[in-house]
UniProtKB/Swiss-Prot annotation:
Keywords: Membrane, Transmembrane, Transmembrane helix
Record's protein name: Protein cornichon homolog 5
GO biological process entries: vesicle-mediated transport
Record membrane topology: Multi-pass membrane protein
Organism name: Arabidopsis thaliana
Primary location: membrane
Length: 135
């Protein structure tokens, strides 16, 4: 039963994480089609960056504490990438450069969504496996 609860909590972490990244991607798409101005886009994205980074760090720590080593190793590249962005101070969207870097910012978030989706599929598998094992 404990393993099932671990996977449910992990799934909730990942679902929240993918919602945050999809929200950022939607904001960038709105900028691309001129539905919103760059100042609003950058303030919306910048508001979500630190919660995304913190949630990814908590998820990696949660995997380590619960002993899910494969998932911890799988989430490390995403965590290290976020740490590298933060250390280089490239984690926030710049209002003046947002039009020029819009495609790159979208591409980064699409890769993040792919990585999170892979983690969700693996977590769902183990969630179902744990649920059926408890019967």
């Amino acid at each position: 039963m404990g393993d099932l609860l671990d996977w449910i909590i992990s799934f909730l972490f990942l679902a929240t994480l993918i919602i945050i990244v999809i929200y950022q991607l939607t904001c960038l798409a709105d900028l691309e089609f001129d539905r919103i101005n760059p100042y609003d886009v950058s303030s919306r994205i910048n508001r979500m960056v630190l919660p995304e980074f913190g949630l990814q760090g908590l998820l990696c720590l949660y995997y380590i504490l619960t002993g899910h080593w494969f998932m911890a190793v799988l989430s490390l590249p995403h965590l290290f990438y976020n740490i590298r962005l933060y250390m280089k101070r490239e984690h926030l969207a710049d209002v003046t450069e947002l039009y020029n870097t819009n495609k790159w910012e979208q591409k980064k978030r699409v890769y993040k969504i792919g990585h999170i989706a892979l983690s969700i599929f693996i977590t769902t598998y183990w969630l179902i496996h744990s649920a059926l094992g408890d019967i």
